[in-house]
Each structure stands twice: as structure tokens, then as C-alpha cells.
């Protein structure tokens, strides 16, 4: 299947790609600023309402900068939330506090926050440790592999950049899987991370799929609109599963992350059914040529 790939290799951030593709936002930066300011002022803000209650997350809490991006991601791109935070810092409504390599923001009028910042630093150090990040990544890849096998997709390659006699040499990168079903081959990338997939990796691997003549299929915790649009323009698919998946045995850490930081995390033994349904629906469309 020949792909019409729109790859913009001269740009290395998706904020730039967004401008080049002229994707119109559904919101203004002023709306994001107002919403983030309300989050730090109003305990009834929408971002505190979904999921189980988290009393330790409230307008008086300190927030890691990346944490705020994820909390707001269903409405705004991460970089736009980051811009809004910068503007609120410039206005003096918020202030920055750096602890080690962690950057926190909190309301400027708050005086007693050091203990809560230190508490969050310990949680961040726990989930960002190499042992946990490796376990989380490997676990999700294993669940994806099981999903493919249960739905009659053949694992053709693992951690590879070559297929059917062609080898990608432009960058030193591999696809997580190359899978096939009914003579259709897919290049698969799996990301079980809180941040978005990096722009350069996204674009390089999209170009790799074009070169190998396979359909790009990314299975991501989340992605910005520009990545969905770029993938659609390349006849591929992003499957989003939203909550970062942890292996069994990490329930205490997952509970602490949610209770203290309201980050979307969960413990699962299989990929969500909606991801499976979307995969099968997409494959049916590919087979039918639509």
C-alpha cells in the first residue's frame, strides 16, 4: 500500500508543524490562561471534578509544570498550557519553585508549601526512576503484543528498522513492532508515557514507514491534535489509551500518584477494549480500501 506522507523534517517541534499545516485551534491562548487561572482559584473547577476525589489536589497545592500540562490535555495541547503558565507567572499570579530538576508552580500568595513540594518530589522520583519507567514501558509493549496475537495479527519483526529486503539507515531508530494481517503490514510504535511522543521521533518513524512501505500505527497514551492530523494525512492511525498503564504490584504507587497529583494512571492486564475495537475497525477500512 503506497503512502502519501507529509513529513516536515526541517521542523523539530510540533508547535512549528502546527503552524506549517495551518491547523486552526478551537481555543485562544487567552482562554487557556483564564482556565488555568481558574484552576488555581476555584475548588469547583472542572479539572477537580472527574474521577475519584483527590483532596490533596486543590487550588492551594503546588503543581509540577508537566503535571499541569497533562491535567489540561483533554482541552488544550501541552505547549499551550505551558505558555499559559508562563503568562500567569509574568502577571505575578503564579510563581515558580525549582527543587532539584523539578519545576513547580503555585499561587504567589501562598506561604506554606515546602512540605507539599517535597512530598511531590518523592512521588516524581519514584515514578520517574529507571526501574519503574522500564517496567511501565515493557509492560505496555507486552499488552500490545498480546492484543495483536489475540486478534490474529502476526508479529513479523520486533525492535526493527528493516522489512522485505529494505533497511532504514537515515537515523539510528527502530520500530517497536512490524505486524501483519491479511497481507497488510503495519509499523507499530508504543508510547506509555505522560509526555507526548517527541516530534522528531514521530516524524522520523513516519518517514521510516513510508520507506519500508508499511502503514504507520502508533499506540500512544495520548497525543496532540497535530499528531492525529499528521497521521491521518499519512493514511495511518493513532490509538489513544489515555491512562498510563502500570503492571500489577504497582497499585500503591498508582494510588499515590492519583491522590496527590491527579495524573491519569492505572493498573491493567490488557489493553482497553476501545483500543482493540478501533484497531479492528481501522484494519477493516484498510482491507476495503476506504
Walk through the language-model features, giving the residues of each.
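Short catalytic-loop micro-motif centered on adjacent basic/acidic residues
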Residues: 189, 215-219
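Nuclease-adjacent, charged terminal/linker segments that flank catalytic cores
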Residues: 1-128, 285-290
Amino acid at each position: 500500500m503506497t503512502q502519501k506522507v507529509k513529513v516536515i523534517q526541517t521542523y523539530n517541534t510540533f508547535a512549528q508543524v502546527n503552524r506549517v499545516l495551518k491547523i486552526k485551534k478551537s481555543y485562544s491562548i487567552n482562554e487557556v490562561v483564564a482556565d488555568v487561572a481558574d484552576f488555581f482559584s476555584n475548588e469547583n473547577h472542572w479539572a477537580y471534578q472527574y474521577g475519584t476525589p483527590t483532596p490533596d489536589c486543590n487550588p492551594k497545592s503546588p503543581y509540577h509544570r508537566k503535571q499541569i500540562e497533562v491535567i489540561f490535555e483533554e482541552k488544550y495541547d501541552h505547549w499551550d498550557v505551558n505558555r499559559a503558565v508562563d503568562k500567569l507567572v509574568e502577571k505575578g499570579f503564579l510563581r515558580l519553585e525549582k527543587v532539584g530538576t523539578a519545576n513547580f508552580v503555585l499561587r504567589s500568595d501562598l506561604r506554606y508549601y515546602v512540605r507539599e513540594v517535597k512530598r511531590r518530589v518523592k512521588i516524581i522520583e519514584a515514578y520517574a526512576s529507571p526501574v519503574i519507567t522500564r517496567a511501565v514501558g515493557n509492560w505496555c509493549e507486552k499488552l500490545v503484543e498480546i492484543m495483536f496475537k489475540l486478534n490474529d495479527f502476526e508479529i513479523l519483526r520486533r525492535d526493527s528498522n528493516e522489512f522485505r529486503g529494505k533497511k532504514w539507515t537515515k537515523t539510528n531508530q527502530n520500530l517497536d513492532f512490524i505486524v501483519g494481517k491479511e497481507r497488510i503490514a503495519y509499523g507499530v510504535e508504543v508510547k506509555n508515557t505522560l509526555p507526548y511522543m517527541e516530534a522528531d521521533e514521530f516524524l522520523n518513524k513516519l518517514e521510516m514507514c513510508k520507506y519500508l512501505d508499511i502503514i504507520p500505527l502508533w499506540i500512544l497514551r495520548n497525543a496532540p491534535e497535530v499528531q492525529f492530523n499528521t497521521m491521518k494525512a499519512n493514511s495511518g492511525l493513532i490509538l489513544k489509551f489515555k491512562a498510563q498503564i502500570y503492571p500489577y504490584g504497582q497499585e500503591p504507587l498508582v494510588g499515590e500518584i492519583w491522590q496527590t497529583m491527579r495524573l491519569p494512571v492505572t493498573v491493567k492486564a490488557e489493553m482497553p477494549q476501545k483500543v482493540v475495537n478501533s484497531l479492528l475497525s481501522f484494519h477493516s477500512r484498510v482491507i476495503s480500501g476506504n
